[in-house]
Amino acid sequence: MDLRIFFISLTCVSALIGPGVLWGAEEGEPVVSEITITAHNSELRFDTEKFTVKAGQKVKLTLVNPADSINLQPHNLLIIEPGTLAEIGTAANAELADPSFLSDRHAVPTSNYVIHHTKLLLPGESETLEFVAPTFAGDYPFLCSYPGHWSVMHGIMVVEN
């Protein structure tokens, strides 16, 4: 068999049966979903409004806060329980009176509804969260909880079965 035909066939088979099967993932081993979200450098928004993961899937989520002369804002990213966006955002605005809220707590409000969060990132910083997606399907909001940002700087992590 011609070597080119062999590699083309191997590529086609790999595409049909799915990622990880021919290239090292053990059967039953979950595939890691890698997502990068960047804070928009001139507006209060993320470049990603929605992403989808499987329930119980391993996730590597990277938040990038780019550095340039336009972006001087710190940002973070919280993943929270469905239906709690306004509650968490309002709590973040209210907790600004606490001097430790920005410095020690990275603008993360005290709440059991916060599932995962990054630290507060200055321009030019990034952070990667590694976690297992919730086991229950649903729309899990993510937001920047720096005071005043949450109402426009949010999106949805869709968890599917």
Predicted feature descriptions by range:
Residues 30-58:
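N-terminal edge beta-strand
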Residues 8-18:
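Bacterial N-terminal signal peptides
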Residues 64, 69, 105, 112-161:
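Extracellular/periplasmic metallocenter environments
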